[in-house]
Amino acid sequence: MRLFTHGQVLALLAFVNTISAIPSFSTNSYPAHPAEPVSIFSQHQPQAPLGLWTRLRNSVIERVWGVPPQQRHRGGNKHQYPPFSAPASLRTRYGDDVVLRFKLQTADEVKALVEASNILFLDVWSSTDEWIDIRLAKDVVPSLLGLLPKSLQTTHVPLIRDLPQTIYESYPSPFQSASGHERGFLPSGEPSSDVTNIFFENYQPLSVIVPWMRLLASMFPSHAQFISIGSSFEGRDIPALRVGVRPANDQKRRRTLIIEGGSHAREWIGVSTVNYVAYSLITSYGKSKSISTLLEQFDFIFIPTINPDGYVYTWETDRLWRKNRQETSLPFCPGVDLDRTWGFEWNGNATGDNPCLESYGGDKPFAGVEAHQLAEWVKEQTEQRNTKFVAYMDLHSYSQQILYPYSYSCLSQPPNLENLEELAMGIAKAIRLTNRKTYAVSSACGGLMASQKKKAKPETFLRMESTGGSALDWFYHDFGVKYAYQLKLRDRGSYGFLLPRENIVPTGKEVFNAVMMLGRFLLGESNAFQELDWDAGFQRPNKDDKPILNDDDDDDDADTNDDGIGRKDDSWIPDEYKGDNDRDESDGGWAFRRLRKR
């Protein structure tokens, strides 16, 4: 328990009083569930559940002053409620969209899938050396299959059959999760008994994250500072936490690590994970010798989302929005991909003059406002603030991968490739020992590689999208950060970007231990990659961590054969279209409707 001085307690009280005046975020911020149980505090006086900030305030008071927490299940209410249907607004926006996975074996298959995706303006969710996930309208599936070779027509796997419903169930309930209502498609689980984890029981909107960050900084002023990296296109601050303890009169350049998430707005798990790691380091200082040493030797810059405009947009309008929200040459296709707009090997020609593409990198290097703001900030810190950036970790989702430079090309190798691979394997080991999750380690070049066991050499495939202009490559090559990684977090496709909230804390612990492993490596510890020392600051999995995904293996494809190859599912194809490879004018109509929905 961290001790507070009298002055700090008074300051915290003043801040908590300020926070308590902030109204709970409106249910208009996301599709509210149409019915929720009401907590009964007496037989005659029903009361609405406590607002989020009231509960956060109470949890702070309970933690700091040792007030016994109130019982979280009043009256023993443990009734289960049936899932509610997605509201009409979501059905209108997402229609009958689904997500399919295609297993790839040959370069011709990849080429055909790339061309078909571009023709139909399809949303590619993720791609690895084994599969590609694509979102599309159900009635467009036969048209897509008609453009593909027969081998792909028989190897598509349904991942998400009802996208609007899955999106609806990914939003947090405006009521406390302990109320007893659990989403119907998830196994029920008790909320964490640790009152300090209340913030991580759900994904949080930006209107909650920023005051929470300020609260942390005010509680722990000795080693946490709330800062702004710059301003977004719409004028929002890009919030961050600087965590570390710099000795007085220290003239050495301060070694600093950046841990960033949310450059792609829809990847909520990256935002929550950055917050979790920051919280864990801040609250463990002075309790763990290993963590205290890290914060005395390094500064950590935690940026939950470099894309605040896009993140807010995913809460208020389109849950699956990827880019930022700045204007482009086409008024109905706003946004720049903030991970394709950086200056090193920017490849804007790959996306042409089409701002409607999800990977559009802008019309020039650093066209993305927020990427330019971050680049200018790190330059200023280096030139004027005596800072040396030694590591960069960019959190994305999904597919469970640890990627190192380069992203723009598989033909170039970084000079310290062996060290990058060694550390990446150590990070993967730390994650595996935490929750038995397997993360693949590879270059981020993005060239899909055929996994054909009969071939002596893998075959380089055509890419699904441009991979130039990445933040990973810029920090490594242009800015000289020796250890730069992109982590693609859970899962491997069962939920994709709509990862249920039960995974927030387990994923946070995995990445926290990965950061601890990174810190030990940077400190030069000779035993950094040996078994995790659970008494040296690493976080153990516990009974409250109930990941809903299979931990026995990481093949999350529910609809696969025993050999791992997907089977054809004719339920996606209307009877009148089976065997008919002709396209009609409805293809273009669906694509245009999708663009207009933006």
From Swiss-Prot:
GO terms for cellular component: extracellular region; vacuole. Residues 22-174 form a propeptide. Coiled coil: none annotated. It holds the Pfam family Peptidase_M14. Zn(2+) binds at residues 264, 267, 396. Residues 202-522 form the Peptidase M14 domain. It is found in: Vacuole; Secreted. Disulfide bonds join 333-356. One of its GO terms (molecular function) is zinc ion binding. Residues 539-598 are annotated as: Disordered. Its main location: other. GO terms for biological process: cell wall organization; proteolysis. Residues 1-21 form the signal peptide. Keywords: Cell wall biogenesis/degradation, Disulfide bond, Glycoprotein, Metal-binding, Secreted, Signal, Vacuole, Zinc. The keyword Signal applies. InterPro entries: Peptidase_M14. The keyword Zinc applies. Residues 550-562 have a biased composition (Acidic residues). Inactive carboxypeptidase that may play a role in cell wall organization and biogenesis. PANTHER family: INACTIVE METALLOCARBOXYPEPTIDASE ECM14 (PTHR11705:SF147), PROTEASE FAMILY M14 CARBOXYPEPTIDASE A,B (PTHR11705). This is Inactive metallocarboxypeptidase ECM14. The gene is ECM14.
